[in-house]
């Protein structure tokens, strides 16, 4: 079953000291390449949200006991499995290393799939694992660094000016 514990066990099994020097670096095979947002991404995969709707009103849901229990469990597991994980924001280094077989898994936003085209290697695409067997659906995350949302309050006095400013800020 594709659940968090199975995934992390596979991550642990993916660590191999390829050069036999007892040190794990880019010359070895890791269980997982990932950005520092792993815990957040695993939380999103549980299907829970930081906000909830209560009679049509949005409220913060992070303080609910189930959310706190899940976040605590994910945090504990990420810390326990951290030795098998290469955490880096340097995707320009990670992608060629992944293509060369230096990691069993690479968790990244789908935008980066096109960057794999320049390499000749077989790759599969998996959803983030379910938290446990009680979860009905697989849930994916939208990375805040790649997709930025901005809202204009319905009672804004200057919505057109705000829209022009947002448009200008998002221009390349």
Language-model-detected regions and their locations in the chain:
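Extracytoplasmic/periplasmic substrate-recognition and gating elements
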Residues: 116-172
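Beta->alpha turn/N-cap motifs
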Residues: 35-38, 108-113
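Glycine-centered hinge/linker elements that transmit conformational signals in sensory
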Residues: 4-13, 41-45, 49-89
């Amino acid at each position: 079953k594709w659940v968090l514990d199975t995934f992390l066990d596979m991550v642990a099994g993916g660590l191999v000291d390829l050069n036999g020097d007892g040190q794990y670096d880019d010359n070895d095979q890791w269980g997982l390449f990932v950005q520092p947002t792993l815990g957040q991404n695993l939380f999103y995969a549980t299907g829970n949200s930081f906000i909830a709707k209560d009679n049509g009103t949005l409220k913060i849901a992070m303080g609910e006991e189930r959310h706190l229990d899940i976040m605590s469990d994910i945090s504990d597991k990420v810390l326990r499995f951290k030795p098998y994980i290469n955490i880096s924001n340097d995707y320009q280094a990670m992608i060629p290393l992944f293509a060369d077989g230096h990691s069993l898994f690479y968790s990244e936003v789908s935008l980066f799939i096109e960057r794999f085209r320049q390499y000749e290697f077989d790759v599969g695409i998996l959803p983030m694992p379910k938290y446990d067997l009680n979860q009905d659906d697989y849930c994916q995350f939208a990375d805040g660094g790649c997709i930025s949302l901005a809202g204009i309050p319905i009672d804004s006095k200057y919505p057109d000016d705000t829209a022009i400013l947002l448009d200008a800020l998002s221009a390349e």
